[in-house]
Amino acid sequence: AASDVYKRQDLEDQSFAIKLFRQSLMKGSEFRERINKHMKNWETERIANMDLIIMQVALAEIMTFPTIPINVTLNEYIDTAKYYSTPKSGTFINGILDSVVNELKKEKLLLKD
């Protein structure tokens, strides 16, 4: 029945959200360290908190869910930043996350495209 499909999808969405939230918190300091390393000429205090949170959650998604392509994740979080943060946040976040992703690939910690 259609209601079973919706219930199953709700459970999958709920499981995804919980796993993403958990990874964002558990590996938050590791993600922030990587983000900080790529923020050339920027002090963390000058960055919008929302931008840091968005980048942290994006990295959690990239590192935790191998079936979601990197460009899909990046596009989603860049759009999120444009909507919930400052007008320039999308470009800023794109640059930082792209740098972090390239570093993770070089370190062989990220094995997807």
Question: Which residue ranges define each predicted feature?
Answer:
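Alpha-helical oligomerization segments
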Residues: 71-76, 80-113
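Membrane topogenic helices and adjacent juxtamembrane segments
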Residues: 13-35
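Amphipathic alpha-helical elements of HEAT/ARM-like alpha-solenoid repeat scaffolds that form extended
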Residues: 14-21, 51-59, 97
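Residue-level detector of well-ordered alpha-helical segments, enriched
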Residues: 1, 16, 50-54, 73, ...
